[in-house]
Amino acid sequence: MDNSVRVRVPATSANLGPGYDCIGLALDLWDEVSVGVLDRPGVMIDVTGEGADTVPHDESHLVMATLRQGLVELGYPHPDAGLHLTAINSIPQSRGLGSSAAAVVSGLALAWGLARPGFPLDRSALLTMAAAIEGHPDNAAPAILGGAQLAWLDGEAVNHIGLTVNPSIVFRVYVPDRLVPTALARQVLPEQVDRVDAVHQVLAASLLVTALTTSPEHLLAATQDWIHQPYRRALMPESAALTDRLRGRGVATVISGAGPTVLALGSRDQLEKVSDVDTAGFVAHDLVLGEGVHFF
């Protein structure tokens, strides 16, 4: 029995405008997490990087809690064993870059490594488990499978289709200092939307798949949103203003996930041409698509 496991899990950006709760992509920004079995009960948790001073250092830590749940579900003979968790975090937390999905996915992958040593990850099983915990698969699917994913729930089953992103498309995230809890970003959404807005949303979401894969010249139109970003503007005015500035320059730009990070996507030339846009209060990262969670 192998008593230590290490995994890398990517940041993810969900929604991409109109693909609310169903489209997401993995980016090459990583958390590296390892676990070792102790010869005594209890837990040790060491965190460096993002969240080091804010995340809990006990059993309530999301990676640890998910790891414990995964050990039980996978039939590990000692699910209450003492564990030493080490996390080196590069994914900003509560910024709309899938930090909670990364924690859930890394916990489940670590559990798999302990319970099934030597066996490759069953990504389908991990996705089912992660979606059950998260409640929606838009971040979990790319975190596990990598690349861009269209994912949806059918009862308890998770379906997904990988999207082959046009190689000309690159990504830039603008990460602000401020946080916006996902729960708060969901609370401001209306229970119902106008039918005209719904029709526009369906059109844009359909166009988004084509724009991402074969026709990137349509990305600006394909990333327009009517059902969630307008209602969240008041929670993240700086992010909304930056999105407006970049879109006004012709660059496809959205709020990443529940925000407040801003995601711009297009060709390298397009992104270089907006390097002069005022981004005070944000840190920019140029990224490409990432692979899914993996042992290393």
Swiss-Prot record:
Give the family per the record: Belongs to the GHMP kinase family. Homoserine kinase subfamily.
SUPFAM superfamilies noted in UniProt: GHMP Kinase, C-terminal domain, Ribosomal protein S5 domain 2-like
InterPro entries assigned to the protein according to its UniProt record, in alphabetical order? GHMP_kinase_C_dom, GHMP_kinase_C_sf, GHMP_kinase_N_dom, GHMP_knse_ATP-bd_CS, Homoserine_kinase, Ribosomal_Su5_D2-typ_SF, Ribsml_uS5_D2-typ_fold_subgr
Kindly list the GO CC terms recorded for this protein. cytoplasm
The answer to keyword Nucleotide-binding applying to this record is: yes
> Which UniProt key words apply to this protein?
Amino-acid biosynthesis, ATP-binding, Cytoplasm, Kinase, Nucleotide-binding, Threonine biosynthesis, Transferase
Q: Where, in this chain's numbering, is ATP bound? A: P92, Q93, S94, R95, G96, L97, G98, S99, S100, A101, A102
Q: Which domain of life is it from?
A: Bacteria
**Pathway field:** Amino-acid biosynthesis; L-threonine biosynthesis; L-threonine from L-aspartate: step 4/5
According to its UniProt record, the EC number is 2.7.1.39
Which NCBIfam families does the entry mention? thrB (TIGR00191)
Q: Give the GO terms filed under biological process for this record.
A: threonine biosynthetic process
Molecular function GO labels: ATP binding; homoserine kinase activity
> Which cellular compartments is it found in?
Cytoplasm
* Species this protein is from: Cutibacterium acnes (strain DSM 16379 / KPA171202)
What does the UniProt function comment say about this protein?
Catalyzes the ATP-dependent phosphorylation of L-homoserine to L-homoserine phosphate.
Give a Pfam family name.
GHMP_kinases_N
Q: What is this protein called?
A: Homoserine kinase
